[in-house]
Amino acid sequence: MVNVKVLAGVPRLYDIRSNNPIWGADLSLSISDMAGWYDGLVSVEASYVGRYQKNAHIEYPHLDLEELLFGSQGVESDVLNMISARANFEYKGVSLRGEYVQKLNDDIYNPALDAAKGNVINIDLGYNYKRFSASATFRRQENMTTFIDFRPLGIGGGNTINYIPLLTRQHTYSLANLNPYRGASVHTGGEVGGQIDLYYSLRNPKVRSKYWNFHANFSMFNTIDHNSKLMGMDMEGRNVWIDFNFDVERQWNKSVKTTFLYSFQRWDEEINHFDSPTAHYCRSHIFVGDVTYKINKKHSLRFEAQYLTSEDYEGDWVAATVEYNFAPKFSFYVSDMWNCEKMQDGAYGNYYMNLNTFEMEHKLLHYYQVGGSFTHNSLRVQLSYGRNRAGYVCSGGVCRFQPAYTGVNLALTLSF
């Protein structure tokens, strides 16, 4: 009926221990249990998080550079207080969850901007019945990036307290994930949008080896009205991301399964770099075909082909993967991803500087990979070699930049 959590500690700041303690508490109250109603769920929850930073309120009135780099302008207290309130409802396949979060005092959410209060509104609606399910999520956030220590210049993911995932589909195919949404709040302080997800499974319960799975997803995000300190002007919110995609999975028999995916993506490339007053929209259409052939109970072969067509950014791409599995322990694969179209001068994309002539040149590179994995109980070892493209790698709604390199990757996963 009642659940209380209390936590306090000193977080890690990249490779060192931070000097700023963080503490918090969470309270959950199940109203449905208290009323003896067990056919559904009604609950309310509340949380508090505090952060202490010594001398956070000190300003630098005569050193504009220090104000910009250390971001202390407008901070009035060494203690940052944040609260949230949540409500949950579930009944006969319908679920509704809402949350409101508030920063009670001014805080630095971007070192280049003044301190300000922040808030988040998040609403989740879901429905499922037999083989159909639908979900919709809406979120508006403003000034909610919260640093462990806002004074260091390193303001990446390792210096972040709160986890605010991106509400877009997390694609598993390489070309669909070539230009993921990285969030507009990094440069503008806020964003508003959401996504809708639909799923339906068509199957005969008496024939398990044959079925259809249909999945569709749509997401859209806009910036919010804000004052751009970088541009020195008020800026209206605008659309920065649209992704519409659907995929169809077909199990033909016990041996053959196919998947087809289509995705349309449009994004504002300018907002990925700075708070620009104008948009530069890039568009891409992605097509994926995936075939798995099960040879016997232990051996299977999978082939995957992808094509991305675009008149913007880096032009067209093609990709292919061949994978052979020896269940339950071994898997081997070889893949290639090729930027197969040159773009006209002035376009975003595949330009590289010749360090001898200092001129921009086209390079249509192959990003090849060969690798394998071994799995035993809870241990998984994966080894690969190849050329890796520079770009953003997203996992669980969190994106990090990965530089281009050619080399060996070794990954070890052990769960216990």
What is each model feature region?
Residues 1-303, 307-318, 328-364, 368-369, ...:
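Signature for the C-terminal beta-barrel architecture of outer-membrane proteins
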Residues 364-395:
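C-terminal structured domain segments
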